[in-house]
Regions:
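Beta-strand/loop nucleic-acid-binding surfaces
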Residues: 58-72
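P-loop NTP-binding catalytic core
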Residues: 74, 87-159
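Short, charged beta-turn/beta-strand-edge "cap" motif at the junction between a beta-strand
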Residues: 68, 84-91, 164
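P-loop NTPase nucleotide-binding module
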Residues: 137-194, 230
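Short nucleic-acid-contacting surface segments enriched for D/E, G, S/T with interspersed K/R
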Residues: 69-81
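P-loop NTPase catalytic core
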Residues: 175-177, 187-373
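Acidic low-complexity intrinsically disordered regions
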Residues: 1-47, 51-59, 76, 89
Length: 373
């Protein structure tokens, strides 16, 4: 059959062109010049890349074959160091250099990756250990959060904020307090669909990892950095670390998934696709306190009172999923009373685990007094 012959020839040619590249490990000869590389591993459907310039794809990313991924039990979000071969003169350049040597995975030998547990199989518990935010007497925001909505390691908290209510200042205050009081925690600030000047401000004022995608980028970039950032956090938790992720904000992340996700045909009110809300829920649901050490704390800002039906629908989906809520009040913010915290509407579930009994009784008494005002 002539057609089969043509197809066979095409298939052979495709194999020679590099279609079979994903299952072949690159070979190194003695006279090759090796260049060291490091970055976060991003595993896609048929191939993987080491993102060398942050969490977004870049021109200097390094290709990793699936054979290397399987052989070393690599996972998305692993921090990888290794080497690539410098192309020789006259040699055809590949679009991406291939990883020829793997030196370390998350700061340890590559062989150690096989024994680590899987994040989804770890046992989640209520937060047991308090993340105290109070630092200096003049820092009121962190003190009020400690009183009204205490945070523990493994908390899944929502910061419910109308526009211009000071949520960015609250997030910066939380980030700086964690850096001062809990230096053992790995801090990640994820800014999605954010203003460029806000990103710069956050990078300069926060001593932690700031991962950002500004509003002038496509929705796919927003979803890419969010997914890779949360996978990075999960890999650290698997190693027993305490990780704190501050997300600004989950409403815009939901909007980005709504734009980027393929249409399912089922549209909720407000123009939200029914499948678009699952990925941000997966992001937020990753927060947990692990039984045998390690925790992932996620504090995410959610926008309300924006006048958008879509924002309302997204917020309603997340309303009951957190175990802590800090609500900001627009009326207080308009009077320039900061931090504009709505004390009655804010609180933490199972706060008695985080606080000693005598402190809890005093705080309840304070709440009753404030409620009566």
């Amino acid at each position: 059959d002539g057609r089969r012959g043509r197809r066979g020839r095409y298939r052979d040619r495709r194999g020679r062109r590099g279609g079979g590249r994903e299952d072949v490990e690159p070979q190194v000869s003695e006279d090759d010049v090796l260049i060291p590389v490091a970055g976060i591993l991003d595993i896609l459907d048929n191939y993987a890349f080491v993102r060398t310039s942050g969490y977004l794809p870049g021109p200097n990313d390094v290709y990793v074959s699936l054979a290397q991924v399987r052989k070393n039990s690599l996972r998305k979000g692993d921090h990888v160091t290794g080497a690539v071969r410098q192309p020789r003169e006259g040699e055809r350049r590949e679009k991406f250099n291939a990883l020829v040597r793997l030196d370390s995975v998350n700061g340890a030998a590559p062989e150690g990756g096989r024994a680590r547990p899987e994040f989804n199989k770890l046992t989640p518990l209520y937060p047991q250990e308090r993340l105290r935010l109070e630092t200096e007497p003049n820092q009121l925001t962190s003190r009020i959060i400690d009183l009204v909505s205490p945070i523990g390691k493994g908390q899944r908290g929502l910061i419910v904020a109308p526009p211009k209510a000071g949520k960015t200042m609250v997030l910066q205050s939380i980030a700086n307090s964690i850096t001062v009081n809990n230096p053992e925690c790995h801090l990640m600030v994820v800014l999605v669909d954010e203003r460029p000047e806000e990103v710069t401000d956050m990078q300069r004022s926060v001593k932690g990892e700031v991962i950002s995608s500004t509003f002038d980028r496509p929705a796919e970039d927003h979803t890419t950095i969010a997914e890779l950032a949360i996978e990075r956090a999960k890999r650290l938790v698997e190693l027993g670390h305490d990780v704190v992720v501050l997300l600004d904000n989950i409403t815009r992340l939901g909007r980005a998934y709504n734009l980027a996700a393929p249409a399912s045909g089922r549209i909720l009110s407000g123009g939200v696709d029914s499948t678009a809300l699952y990925p941000p829920k997966k992001f937020f649901g990753a927060a947990r306190n692990i039984e045998d050490g390690g925790s992932l704390t996620i504090l995410a800002a959610a926008l309300v009172e924006t006048g958008s039906r879509m924002d309302e629908v997204i917020f309603e989906e997340f309303k009951g999923t957190g175990n802590s809520e800090l609500k900001l009040d627009r009326k207080l913010a308009e009077k320039r009373i900061f931090p504009a915290v709505d004390v009655d509407a804010s609180g933490t579930r199972k706060e008695e685990i985080l606080m000693p009994g005598d402190e809890l009784q005093i705080i309840w008494k304070l709440r009753r007094v404030l409620h009566a005002l």
